[in-house]
Amino acid sequence: MEPKLMFKPTEKQYTALQQAFDYYNEKLFKDSLPQVMLTLNRERNTFGYYVPSIWTDDNGVEQWGEIALNPDYILKDGERTDKEVYATLVHEMCHLWQEYDGSAPRRCYHNKDFAEKMERVGLITSSDGTPNGKRTGQRVTHYIVEGGPFDMAFQAMPDELLIPCHTLFALKGESKKKIKKARPKSVTYFCPKCGATVKGKEGTNILCGDCMEKMLVKTGRDR
């Protein structure tokens, strides 16, 4: 009798994240980005962050930055999809790009150079996740351009690169917010033309009655 193969969650999770980083590096950055240390970190009030040159090898010769994703927003039955989590990964990869090829500002600030790079990869910077938000600033998130480079790259991404492990509840402060399995996902949609917003079930096709435009999913904040 052959021994049962044990599922190794750490290996599965970080292998998928590394492969996703390499995939988007190739598809959106032409393999121009250096490697980083990918981590999961429950930094408060943020989906993810990038820190430059914070890791080194035993000899102190090589240095790497860190990209962290917040597991409190990688929930099994939460509002954020794998697509939105990987949009955060690409957001932080744009910070990495700016560190080496752009005009890097002070940490966590999103300047015009950053906003333009984000747009080129198919993400629009916004202070509130809608077209009405400010494109630059200290606290800026983004929304996904439908049919843009990131959207198309995600659709073509192999299934094995999807996130294999999701958290069952969020650890925010000292409380544990249990997620009910039967609860339908509710997200905020916005009109890319007029900025009107509406709540609805995830996956619903909603048209703006004023503009007759398909409404897009609004995302939260990144650093």
Task: Describe each PLM feature range.
Residues 4-80, 100-223:
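Metalloprotease/metallohydrolase-associated module, dominated by Zn2+-dependent proteases
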Residues 87-100:
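Active-site recognition of the HExxH zinc-binding catalytic motif
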